[in-house]
Amino acid sequence: MQQLITQVDANSEQYQANFTHHDKLRQQLRDRVAEVAQGGSERSRQRHLDRGRLLPRERVRRVLDPGSPFLEIGALAAFGMYDGDAPAAGLIAGIGLVEQRYVMIVCNDSTVKGGTYYPATVK
């Protein structure tokens, strides 16, 4: 296989500035995705657990083949909208393996406004 030759100078000021900038953006993205993955408020999540119910992301995890990946899409839908009360627009959606077949999974997050839809949920 032919090797691709780069002309990027990893020691240049511009490279270092770009690297630092994009590293901050990467960390910001990770933080936002982790925040959204919490679902609704702590109170809502606790009420869910007190009723003996699984949290929505746990339900999704249990449907998937053990150890298989889940490619979530739309995790940042409605981010910064609705006063921050709509993580992932109240919906967990993605592609995963069930019985070794790729499937699309859609799960209403009942910890977010009881699982009701926001306008951004259907966009």
Where are the predicted features?
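Terminal-region recognition feature
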Residues: 1-123
